[in-house]
């Protein structure tokens, strides 16, 4: 008789293999920094209408794209991280037109590069988070992704299995000092310093509200 449980076993094995592959390695991170040319560009004070205290800008390159990384610094040593490929002006003009017509459209966060490198990028970001913690040990972090396309409604924001995978890596690295909160509705998460959270119970709401304001 055919073993109907085989696909489930294979699925579990695949997940276990994937989780083993995403364990953070500083050696691997250093290798990726060199390979992708990770570089600090500059820090900026907030522009009009922005609520962060400081913006740190980084770049790195893949064979197809140049990526921009933004790390926004807020009160309570909260850092919100985002990244996106640098796209030409024609892309934005076209998407603006689609949005104005009520059609599905993309932004820099939801544009699909099809490079299949999100875990490599996350490794780079974890490495930078560790660097920040060396300087500010009570820091907390947030990150967010995006749906495959936008329709200008809250229903765009959907659960994603990728977030669970990402948070496995984050839990493995930060669980001793931080609580990792999965925000699958926003395709993102929070990494909250336990000591700060104990002293300021509203920290989670503060960080989540800032993350949501970007979506």
Give the ranges of each region predicted by the language model.
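Non-catalytic substrate-recognition and accessory regions of acyl/acetyltransferase enzymes
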Residues: 2-4, 12-215
């Amino acid at each position: 008789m055919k073993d109907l449980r085989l696909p489930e076993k294979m699925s579990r094995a695949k997940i276990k293999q994937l989780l083993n592959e995403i364990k953070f390695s500083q050696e691997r991170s250093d290798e990726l920094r060199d390979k992708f040319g990770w570089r600090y560009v500059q820090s900026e004070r907030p522009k009009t209408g922005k609520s962060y205290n400081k913006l740190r800008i980084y770049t790195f390159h893949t064979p197809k794209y140049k990526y921009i990384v933004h790390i926004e610094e807020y009160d309570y040593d909260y850092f919100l991280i985002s990244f996106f490929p640098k796209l030409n002006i024609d892309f934005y003009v076209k998407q603006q037109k689609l949005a104005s017509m009520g059609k599905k459209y993309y932004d820099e966060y939801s544009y699909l590069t099809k490079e299949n490198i999100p875990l490599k990028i996350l490794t780079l970001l974890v490495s930078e988070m560790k660097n920040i913690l060396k300087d500010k040990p009570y820091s907390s972090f947030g990150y967010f992704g995006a749906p495959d396309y936008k329709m200008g409604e809250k229903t765009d924001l959907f659960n994603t299995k990728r977030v669970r995978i990402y948070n496995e890596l984050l839990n493995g690295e930060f669980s001793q000092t931080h609580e990792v909160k999965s925000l699958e509705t926003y395709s993102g998460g929070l990494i909250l310093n336990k000591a700060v959270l104990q002293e300021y119970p509203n920290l989670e709401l503060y960080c989540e509200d800032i993350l949501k304001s970007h979506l």
